[in-house]
Structures are given as structure tokens and as C-alpha cells.
């Protein structure tokens, strides 16, 4: 049975750990969206791996890792990541890593534009060039991995891309694109990149009959359509993107991952944000610092109306709660169960667009903290009563089963129900 792991909040929910934990039960792990702007941290024993574009399954020797066509690929960043993991003893070779050859490539000129646009618009991007790369993809002028197979095709595509970028760069006072430098840098990486490249139709054949675990980047509240627009990423993060960004067939399980609280990096609304001692304590105990950006994450209480909305649009079938242990020391824990509108009407499912343009007041369930450690507990029955009540309340409010709970940073610190 194939499964997809998606984030139910603003990213950083712990999807990488859950994918790594589950990967041993699947033949392959497939990244279907995003780029190296989204970091996944996986802890195995005493080693911490900070992955950016490689699927979290790369740490499993007998699992095939796939980068699907929905990913925008920084070629130098990918090779740097591969080289670093190889130095740490991780086995990576053609056959263990497969990349759809119609992936679009993130170039230095994309990063330069990202920095330029962020200075003006301040959307809170990671300045990795992801948005400008997606712009070129949609405008049909981007460079794809398969373009590296032909010197003639690569030069032709670079010429068209440079024509557009030079217009933008002239207006911004930047130097023109040097096509020869871009061509030389891409051509120098060609052989090392293309050894992993496979056309999508061949990927389907290679993975036919094999179980697949799809790994999402970011979270649904950063989705370009369903998130807190315009403070979102440039791609889609949900089930539809699994189909389009991997093109490998249907999914039976949609596993939604959420923290027991919420965090957000950068700009945009965070309705339950705690800009106070609670928020500072969540940030400190949860070590809430962006894997890629290094920025401190804003923290708040768990927002269930938004999660209900995400579950509805993403077709979530089960829930995973992560970082339960971060809440171990709190005397009181708050769960936002609804919003109150202007006329006092309670809203239990709320779209981000409503929150962006209307004033709603968060309504909380106040729960007594359990004040004891949940770290490494292996059975739900052995959790403190307060922790069990917290999980069961979320389960009841969302009307979906909580099938896994992460209660520590390590690979093994996940309990199943």
C-alpha cells in the first residue's frame, strides 16, 4: 500500500523523521515537491543528518530514493549534499538514487532574483531561488535536467532564459547574464548529474510493483493555492502534487503530520502565536530554528480549525503528532478548537483566506499539563494521563485517528497506536 506524508501546518512538522521511521517498510521514498529550501532533520543514533533535497529514505541502505519531476533542483546543492553524505558513510549510487530527468534546475541567476524580490516584497523566502525557478518553469523558459544531454539544446534554452532575465536585470541595475559561465558550470556537472537521471516513463517501469512512500516538503499552509497567500511557497504541497510531481500512480494512505503546537518561519499570519513566555519556552524546548534558514521559528498553540481545513482539502486519512515531549513541562496546554466571528458565531473549520482578511478570535480548550516525561515511551497506555487526554482530544476534534506519536528526536522514538 503506497502512502504520502504531508505537513498539516507551516512546515517543520517533523515529516523527515516520520518518513525515515517508516521508510524501512517501503521499497522506495519519493520526493514530489519543493527544492533545497526545505530542510529535513533526521537523527540516527549519535548522528544528525540535515537533508535539503535528497529524500529521507537515502539513509536506508535497501530503499530506493527518487526525486520526482515536481522538485526544482539546485544541481550544485544536490551534488554537495551527495558528497557530504558519502563522506559520512552513506551509500549513494545510480540505482539507489533516481532523478526524473524533467526536473527543472535552480540556477545562480534564480537566487540573485530571489534576493532582489525579497528585499522589496518581504515574503519571508529562504532566498534559495525556488520562486524564480518556478516562474521560469511555468513561463516555459526553464532549464531541465534532460537539457544537459545535448550541448545544442542547452545553449538554445540558456539563450532564451537569458533574454528574459537580462530585461529584468537591466531594470534592477544588475549585470547581464553571462551565458558562457552558466553553460560551463552546468556542463561541468553534466556527467555526475545525468548518471542518476531517468525519464518518467522509465521510472514507472523501475518502480512498478514496488511500494512507495511519498515525502512532502513544506506544509499545506504554505501551499500556493491552499495556504496563507501571499506568504506561501511557490508550489503545491498536497495530494494533487503527489500525483503530478511524482507521476507514479495512486496513493492509498495520506499521513498528515502536525506538531502538538505550531511554528512558522518568516512572514505571514500565525493566529495562535504566543509572543510571550509561552512562545519563548516552546522555541527553547523545541529547538525551533530553521534547518535551512537558521531563523528562529515563531511559536504558538495548536490550531485545529486550520488543520481541519487542510485535512478536508488534502484528503488526509490519519494523523501523526510530533514533538509531544516538548510539552512535558507545561502546567497548562492550550488547544485552539474554534474561532469566534464578529457576531459571536463559532467557526470550527477555517480557511486561511478568511483569516487573512477577517478578524477572528481564537477559542481555546485549556488542558492541564502532565508534568512528566514522555520521551521514549513505547506504548500509548504508558503515557501520562494528561498526554493521553491531549492526543484523544485532538483525535476527537479532527475526527481522524492518531496512528503515531513522536516523543523524542531519534528515529526509534515513535510510538504506534
UniProtKB/Swiss-Prot annotation:
Pathway: Purine metabolism; AMP biosynthesis via de novo pathway; AMP from IMP: step 1/2. GO terms for biological process: 'de novo' AMP biosynthetic process; IMP metabolic process. It is found in: Cytoplasm. Binds 1 Mg(2+) ion per subunit. It catalyses: IMP + L-aspartate + GTP = N(6)-(1,2-dicarboxyethyl)-AMP + GDP + phosphate + 2 H(+). SMART domains: Adenylsucc_synt (SM00788). GO terms for cellular component: cytoplasm. It comes from the Bacteria. The active site is at 12 (proton acceptor), 40 (proton donor). Mg(2+) binds at residues 12, 39. Keywords: Cytoplasm, GTP-binding, Ligase, Magnesium, Metal-binding, Nucleotide-binding, Purine biosynthesis. GTP binds at residues 11-17, 39-41, 297, 323-325, 406-408. One of its GO terms (molecular function) is GTP binding. Pfam families: Adenylsucc_synt. Its EC number is 6.3.4.4. InterPro entries: Adenylosuccin_syn_GTP-bd, Adenylosuccin_syn_Lys_AS, Adenylosuccinate_synth_dom1, Adenylosuccinate_synth_dom2, Adenylosuccinate_synth_dom3, Adenylosuccinate_synthetase, P-loop_NTPase. IMP binds at residues 12-15, 37-40, 126, 140, 218, 233, 295. Plays an important role in the de novo pathway of purine nucleotide biosynthesis. Catalyzes the first committed step in the biosynthesis of AMP from IMP. Homodimer. Belongs to the adenylosuccinate synthetase family. This is Adenylosuccinate synthetase.
Amino acid at each position: 500500500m503506497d502512502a504520502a506524508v504531508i505537513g498539516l501546518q507551516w512546515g517543520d512538522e517533523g515529516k523527515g523523521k516520520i518518513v525515515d521511521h517508516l521508510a524501512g517498510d517501503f521499497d522506495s521514498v519519493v520526493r514530489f515537491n519543493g527544492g533545497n529550501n526545505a530542510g529535513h532533520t533526521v537523527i540516527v543514533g549519535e548522528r544528525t543528518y540535515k537533508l535539503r533535497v535528497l529524500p529521507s529514505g537515502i539513509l536506508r541502505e535497501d530503499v530506493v530514493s527518487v526525486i520526482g519531476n515536481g522538485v526544482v533542483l539546485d544541481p550544485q546543492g544536490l551534488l554537495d549534499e551527495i558528497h557530504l553524505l558519502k563522506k559520512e558513510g552513506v551509500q549513494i549510487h545510480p540505482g539507489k538514487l533516481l532523478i526524473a530527468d524533467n526536473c527543472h534546475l535552480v540556477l545562480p541567476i534564480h537566487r540573485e532574483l530571489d534576493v532582489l524580490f525579497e528585499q522589496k516584497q518581504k515574503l519571508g523566502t529562504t532566498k534559495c531561488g525556488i520562486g524564480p525557478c518556478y516562474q521560469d518553469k511555468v513561463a516555459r523558459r526553464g532549464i531541465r535536467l534532460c537539457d544537459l544531454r545535448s550541448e545544442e539544446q542547452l545553449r538554445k534554452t540558456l539563450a532564451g532564459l537569458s533574454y528574459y532575465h537580462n530585461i529584468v536585470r537591466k531594470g534592477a541595475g544588475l549585470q547581464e547574464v553571462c551565458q558562457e559561465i552558466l553553460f560551463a558550470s552546468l556542463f561541468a556537472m553534466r556527467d555526475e548529474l545525468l548518471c542518476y537521471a531517468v525519464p518518467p516513463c522509465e521510472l514507472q517501469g523501475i518502480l512498478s510493483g514496488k511500494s512507495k512512500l511519498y515525502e512532502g516538503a513544506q506544509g499545506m499552509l504554505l501551499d500556493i493555492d491552499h495556504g496563507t497567500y501571499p506568504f506561501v511557497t511557490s508550489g503545491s504541497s498536497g495530494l494533487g502534487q503527489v500525483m503530478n510531481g511524482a507521476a507514479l500512480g495512486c496513493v492509498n494512505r495520506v499521513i498528515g503530520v502536525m506538531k502538538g503546537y505550531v511554528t512558522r518561519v518568516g512572514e505571514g499570519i500565525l493566529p495562535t502565536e504566543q509572543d510571550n513566555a509561552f512562545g519563548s519556552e516552546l522555541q527553547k524546548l523545541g529547538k525551533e530554528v530553521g534547518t535551512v534558514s537558521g531563523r528562529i521559528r515563531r511559536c504558538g498553540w495548536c490550531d485545529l480549525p486550520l488543520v481541519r481545513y487542510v485535512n478536508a482539502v488534502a484528503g488526509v486519512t490519519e494523523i501523526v503528532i510530533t514533538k509531544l515531549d516538548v510539552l512535558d513541562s507545561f502546567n497548562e496546554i492550550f488547544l485552539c478548537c474554534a474561532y469566534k466571528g464578529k457576531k459571536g458565531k463559532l467557526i470550527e473549520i477555517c480557511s486561511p483566506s478568511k483569516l487573512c482578511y477577517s478578524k477572528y478570535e481564537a477559542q481555546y480548550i485549556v488542558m492541564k499539563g502532565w508534568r512528566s516525561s514522555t520521551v521514549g515511551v513505547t506504548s500509548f497506555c504508558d503515557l501520562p494521563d494528561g498526554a493521553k487526554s491531549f492526543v484523544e482530544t485532538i483525535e476527537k476534534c479532527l475526527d481522524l485517528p492518531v496512528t503515531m506519536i513522536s516523543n523524542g528526536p531519534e528515529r526509534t522514538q515513535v510510538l504506534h497506536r
